[in-house]
């Protein structure tokens, strides 16, 4: 039995992973995590929770929701001291880049954080395979919201609102602290059903994403290739 563990930064990354895995052939979701046919985050209660499994029971996929990047070190310590460290074959991290601070890009800062924690768990279990995907594209600063925005089918709306945000930012009373989230909220306000968060949008409006978009395929292929 192969066991793969995905460690996600937050609810948005968990829902994105769920949607991608849920469209993968021969995978079955743990129906204890569902409510009215969709994923319910509050049902992910255990430290490491069974997420999906394949039809012949040769693969189990587990999930851990960090609920914030600052919880990564605590997770690593708990994982190192758990019996699961000997059972898991591969551990994969999906996290935001975020943005530059001082001389460090958000991507470099997040990559260093992940690699430091990979080093810790590999010291305890050298055979544990590891990997990571840092949104939006595993090389640039940004967030999972950027990945979703750039993969939407409504490209004309996306480009229009991106330009609007740039203009609004210049208004004296504008208080835009997170451009990606502000852009995302304005775009989702044009869609039906209207959803105010990335996780809720993924839950109800996943069909509005272009699955063949190169940026989306990059994370989709990372996930699917790592469970082969």
Model-derived features: where do they sit?
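Short, surface-exposed loop/strand segments
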Residues: 1-87, 228
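Hydrophobic, Leu/Ile/Phe/Ala-enriched alpha-helical segments that form helix-helix packing faces
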Residues: 21-25, 79-83, 114-125, 152, ...
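Charge-rich, solvent-exposed alpha-helical interaction surfaces
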Residues: 43, 47, 62, 110-113, ...
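Short flexible/disordered coil segments
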Residues: 62-70, 129, 157-161, 192-206
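Alpha-helix boundary/N-cap detector
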Residues: 70, 105, 109, 207-210, ...
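Activity-critical C-terminal alpha-helical subdomain
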Residues: 89-189
